[in-house]
Amino acid sequence: MNRPRVLLADDNEQLLERVAEHLASSFDVAGIAHDGQDLISKALRLVPDVIVADITMPVLTGIEALRRLQGTGLASRFVFLTVHREDEFLQACFEEGAVGYVVKSHMNPDLIPAIHSALAGKLFVSPCLSTGSSTHAPKSRS
């Protein structure tokens, strides 16, 4: 059985190396992007199963990259790996169709379960986040 393919996107090279190393035992890291435009190009070329991206990147944000990928026919699931804990970022990601939201400081316990959830079509939010009474549901992928 083929291992799921993951595309990583972040402008922090050291973090990308740590994430790739963390995922190597469970997933095939198909590629690495360093900004939002690079993310779009590589996603369309590599067609990964899951994209793990930062929100704050040069050229285009991760949210804008996801927005632009919508409607291209790309079926990749999107998981954000970010420092942002604010509810408005979480909401914006899910409104654009993301299925996962992981806080960078909780990457080790949360990222692999988030990717597995994404592959199963399920929503994942780092448990350290308190979403109050908000309900965050991913956008329909019809």
Name these PLM-found stretches.
Residues 9-10, 33, 51:
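Conserved sequence signature across two-component system core domains
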Residues 10-12, 85:
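Acidic di-acidic motifs
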Residues 13-31:
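Two-component/phosphorelay signaling modules centered on CheY-like receiver
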Residues 35-38, 61-64:
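Acidic catalytic/metal-coordinating carboxylates
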Residues 46-52:
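Active-site beta3 strand of CheY-like receiver
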Residues 54, 82:
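Active-site residues of response regulator receiver
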Residues 57:
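Receiver (REC) domain active-site loop signature in two-component systems and cognate sites
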Residues 88-95, 99-142:
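Short, flexible helix-to-coil linker/hinge segments that flank and couple to helix-turn-helix
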